[in-house]
């Protein structure tokens, strides 16, 4: 019954969010330490592929989320050469986390459905079941204008297909992507 009520609540929140004025299209994910393309000097060219958050030889990436239940990337590339890799999640919207909160949770692709189901009842722990062994890493739940980071060991991604998603109820169907281990 709790899951049913949670799903109804998520649907109501999703419908309310969808009725909002659409935001501008999301910019590409920016590696940490670099200015977004819109802030870069005119002489610098923006990367051509906005579909992935590249590791680009460094050990950090930034993923943006918004009030339209979107991440600005569908692929986070993690370099095998890194001892640690940090992903910063930025919520570029304005709505509070109670109505349009986002997190970024990494798990094996085959485990993600279970992570979602167990997360629905875990509002007090940012919609992530406490001590869930299936979760490689996750950020805290954030609202508009906030950010949160996670740090992981890339070696944990060596044995399988991994995904990232927002586990706020109703968001995972739209807010998800692949985590790719690269050379």
Swiss-Prot record:
Pfam families found in the cross-reference section:
Copper-bind
What residue spans carry the region label Disordered? 27-51
Mode of membrane association = Lipid-anchor
Covalent lipidation (N-palmitoyl cysteine), chain numbering? 18
- CDD domains (UniProt xref): Azurin
Q: How is the cofactor bound?
A: Binds 1 copper ion per subunit.
Q: Which UniProt keywords apply?
A: Cell outer membrane, Copper, Electron transport, Lipoprotein, Membrane, Metal-binding, Palmitate, Signal, Transport
Query: What cofactor does this protein call for?
Result: Cu cation
- UniProt GO MF annotations: copper ion binding; electron transfer activity
For the Plastocyanin-like domain, which residue ranges apply?
57-183
Q: Where in the cell is it found?
A: Cell outer membrane
Binding of Cu cation occurs at 102, 166, 171, 175
Taxonomic lineage of the native organism: Bacteria, Pseudomonadati, Pseudomonadota, Betaproteobacteria, Neisseriales
Bilayer-crossing residues are none
Cited InterPro entries: Azurin, BlueCu_1, BlueCu_1_BS, Cu-binding_ET, Cupredoxin
Q: What is this protein called?
A: Outer membrane protein H.8
Which region is the signal sequence?
1-17
GO cellular component terms, semicolon-separated: cell outer membrane
Lipidated positions (S-diacylglycerol cysteine) are: 18
